[in-house]
Amino acid sequence: MAAIKPMISVEYIGKATVVRFTDEKILEEKDIQALQDSIMPMIESASGGINLILDFGNVQYLSSAVLGLLIRISKRIYENDGRLLLCNINPKIYEIFKITRLTKTFDIYKDTESAAEDLS
């Protein structure tokens, strides 16, 4: 597993690239920018689209700016014929996804294995 700074680790499972957020909090603008700078090149460099699973298992708090980043990531992935799947979302954070109706925008799974299975 390759570590990418600052707050993610990357793993490959079958057809999926799994990005795990390693920090409990994603709140600062500089951290959100760093995430974008780490994830967008993966999307751009994937030939034929990327199947990206974002694993929120460690995340307890996130700012609303992260939701905007997720929408930008999603748009870029779908433009390149890939898929974005989210998993392991904390119940409190999941409530935010429900309130903002992002549960209708994103494919959300219980865990990484379920998400990866959907891609096979």
Residue ranges and their predicted role:
Residues 107-111:
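Short acidic-hydrophobic, aromatic-tinged amphipathic segments that line or gate anion-handling sites
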Residues 116-120:
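Short hydrophobic/aromatic patches at helix-to-coil boundaries
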Residues 91, 113-114:
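Acidic phosphotransfer microenvironment of two-component signaling modules
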Residues 26-105:
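Amphipathic alpha-helical interaction surfaces in cytosolic regulatory modules
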